[in-house]
Curated annotation (Swiss-Prot):
Glycosylation sites: N71, N136
Membrane-traversing stretches: none
Cysteine pairings via disulfide bonds: C327-C393, C356-C426, C360-C428
Name of the protein: Growth/differentiation factor 2
Length: 429
């Protein structure tokens, strides 16, 4: 077994150990008495006795590693996972995954629902609909916010004359900390943006400066409040307003775009280097420890001319070649429902992760891109087969996928190009 093969794709291949069986999580821990020759770690064919391996615990440990790579402390509670994400986030995910020609400006997108709203109804003396919207927005400080949008659904609440065109305006203010009064002085709020309204539907307003201020402020004091004023300019609609009552279908929400450069390709390359380094150290230790002993033992296999017995060597090669195919990339469909992660991973429901299977047999072909070390290890294995293992068939290049999930606070989060989730190339290392 090649230990490094596990490290290179965490949380990729090892977290999905049970998906090959296609069984629900609760049935995996029991297993079958006969085992499966193609089973992953810890079951017959995987290198450990079946009774010593707890697949449920294994998946739980890998889930912790997976969550850590997403900067999460845990999965959201059940009441938070039941809340449906905005359709906008699902549409955005579909656009990211279907259109390969475009590269988004930000690699992380989050949507934040409105926490509460305080409203005042328009009167003859005050012909505006006014709302203070409260949000709870939290962005890790190591991320760089590139854009923040407030999305409002504007509609006519009271049609007077359908023949008149709809016309109005929306004005947004950033309400400073500790300010709640409607008649507060202008210095307690900051103008952000105004926008003309000419039709019913979703409106997008850019409010990046407010969100950046909130993130910089003390989260225990900041209330993350916006004042929204809606005015109708035509007689056709007496009351133009946004959807804010509890239970409304189209409640306001925030979309925050940010970049996280703290992980990704660099981290994936580091994993690959660690894997190769581990394999090299393992073989060198074997050679230094057992080289002389093995040399003495192997002398009995030499003929009078001092050559390795051709018959035994050829037999070993045939046995090795018959043990399986050469190293190659094979299909591995991952279904998050099968491993019990579908409550917080929104999309994809499943994807093609691929895996590296097969042996690294002598002579190593060019298509497995062997390193010099892998070639040397393979030659040494022919000489000392009981002491030195063959080179390992492992991922040499990984590719990303986009993932839409709910973080530990239940916030729908889209991570574009989450690295290390699919095998692109396999090789002998």
């Amino acid at each position: 077994m090649c230990p490094g093969a596990l490290w290179v794709a965490l949380p990729l291949l090892s977290l999905l150990a049970g998906s090959l069986q296609g069984k629900p999580l609760q049935s995996w821990g029991r297993g079958s008495a006969g085992g499966n020759a193609h089973s992953p770690l810890g079951v017959p064919g995987g290198g450990l006795p079946e009774h010593t391996f707890n697949l449920k615990m294994f998946l739980e440990n890998v889930k912790v590693d997976f969550l850590r790579s997403l900067n999460l402390s845990g999965v959201p509670s059940q009441d938070k996972t039941r809340v449906e994400p905005p359709q906008y986030m699902i549409d955005l995910y579909n656009r990211y995954t279907s259109d390969k020609s475009t590269t988004p400006a930000s690699n992380i997108v989050r949507s934040f629902s409105m926490e509460d709203a305080i409203s005042i109804t328009a009167t003859e003396d005050f012909p505006f609909q006014k709302h203070i919207l409260l949000f709870n927005i939290s962005i890790p400080r190591h991320e760089q916010i590139t854009r923040a949008e407030l999305r409002l659904y504007v509609s006519c609440q009271n049609h007077v004359d359908p023949s008149h065109d709809l016309k109005g305006s929306v004005v947004i203010y950033d309400v400073l900390d500790g300010t709640d009064a409607w008649d507060s002085a202008t210095e307690t709020k900051t103008f952000l943006v105004s926008q003309d309204i000419q039709d019913e539907g979703w409106e997008t307003l850019e409010v990046s400066s407010a969100v950046k201020r909130w993130v910089r402020s003390d989260s225990t004091k900041s209330k993350n409040k916006l004042e929204v004023t809606v005015e109708s300019h035509r007689k056709g609609c007496d009351t133009l307003d946004i959807s804010v009552p509890p239970g409304s279908r189209n409640l306001p929400f925030f979309v925050v775009f940010s970049n996280d450069h703290s992980s990704g390709t660099k981290e994936t390359r580091l994993e690959l280097r660690e894997m190769i380094s581990h394999e090299q150290e393992s073989v060198l230790k074997k050679l230094s420890k057992d080289g002389s002993t093995e040399a003495g033992e192997s002398s009995h296999e030499e003929d009078t001319d001092g050559h390795v017995a051709a018959g035994s060597t050829l037999a070993r090669r045939k046995r090795s070649a018959g043990a399986g195919s050469h190293c190659q990339k094979t299909s591995l469909r991952v279904n998050f429902e099968d491993i019990g992660w579908d409550s917080w991973i929104i999309a994809p429901k499943e994807y093609e992760a691929y895996e590296c299977k097969g042996g690294c047999f002598f002579p190593l072909a060019d298509d497995v891109t062997p390193t010099k070390h892998a070639i040397v290890q393979t030659l040494v294995h022919l000489k000392f087969p009981t002491k030195v293992g063959k080179a390992c068939c492992v991922p040499t290049k990984l590719s990303p996928i986009s993932v839409l999930y709910k973080d530990d606070m239940g916030v729908p989060t889209l991570k574009y190009h989450y690295e290390g989730m699919s095998v692109a190339e396999c090789g002998c290392r």
